[in-house]
Amino acid sequence: MSWFTPEVIDVILTVVRAIVVLLAVVVCGALLSFVERRLLGWWQDRYGPNRVGPFGMFQIAADMLKMFFKEDWNPPFVDRMIFTLAPVVAMSALLIAFVVIPITPLWGVADLNIGLLFFFAMAGLSVYAVLFAGWSSNNKYALLGSLRASAQTVSYEVFLGLALMGVVVQVGSFNMRDIVEYQANNLWFIIPQFFGFCTFFIAGVAVTHRHPFDQPEAEQELADGYHIEYAGMKWGMFFVGEYIGIILISALLVTLFFGGWHGPFGILPQVPFLWFALKTAFFIMLFILLRASIPRPRYDQVMDFSWKFCLPLTLINLLVTAAVVLYNTPAVAAQ
């Protein structure tokens, strides 16, 4: 009897796809640091990294070597186990969230009927990582930074979910492939769910703690926030994890609001990966552009904005979407 039954082969292929996708995401997250520095230099009319290799292309390799050989030092006053666990949770939770994103019709790790719920479950783990890092560091700046980050993340994750409920109500499914295929036969959700898209994008920037929502890491106030005591590879995991979060939110924006791997008006359906990559790269550059162009508001302004603007907008969007869906399905409404 052969061990290579169809079920075993399917498991092997799933594991291979998962390894390829996760390695690609980690590599892209590391390279994104160099891309961001070059783009910021270009937009701000100054030199970016341009000393190591042609056009500074080997700067990321130099940074990685420096990080690998830095001493992995644990301060004597920290809780060692939780201090070490925090960066692992921060990076691994975001990586696991990638398994439900369909990149092309044939390439994706897991096709879950509860794909969006799985994403929210994994994204919610990042709050624990931040709290672990701040509390275990036994540092007042780290603790204040973690409290800021957790409050901000929990607040904006509410609107992250509510913004997607309009999409779920229209499609009738939490499966991301179903959402992409629905957009192939209808308008992309950027048009009927424009307010949901705006709220999701704002909440995505806040959840990833990117500028201008980077108050948990404000250098002037908190001396780099909850990872002030980290060095070496532990700090590197937080650093790369932030860029992985940018890629994750950008890929979700493409999947949920911009047709996924489909091109506009059905153009060039033979290259689905190219369309997905181009649209994701556009939103990544938009993240970087925000850092270059918008000043950092106060923390109280960030929290006021979430509850006084994002909450009413998402609720109105959800109610209007539900009313339109019910109006177009009178049989369901009558029952």
From Swiss-Prot:
It catalyses: a quinone + NADH + 5 H(+)(in) = a quinol + NAD(+) + 4 H(+)(out). It is a multi-pass membrane protein. GO terms for molecular function: NADH dehydrogenase activity; oxidoreductase activity, acting on NAD(P)H, quinone or similar compound as acceptor; quinone binding. The keyword Cell inner membrane applies. Keywords: Cell inner membrane, Cell membrane, Membrane, NAD, Quinone, Translocase, Transmembrane, Transmembrane helix, Ubiquinone. Its main location: membrane. GO terms for biological process: aerobic respiration. PANTHER family: NADH DEHYDROGENASE SUBUNIT 1, NADH-UBIQUINONE OXIDOREDUCTASE CHAIN 1. NCBIfam families: PRK06076.1-1 (NF004740), PRK06076.1-2 (NF004741). This is NADH-quinone oxidoreductase subunit H. It comes from Pseudomonas entomophila (strain L48). The lineage of its organism: Bacteria, Pseudomonadati, Pseudomonadota, Gammaproteobacteria, Pseudomonadales.
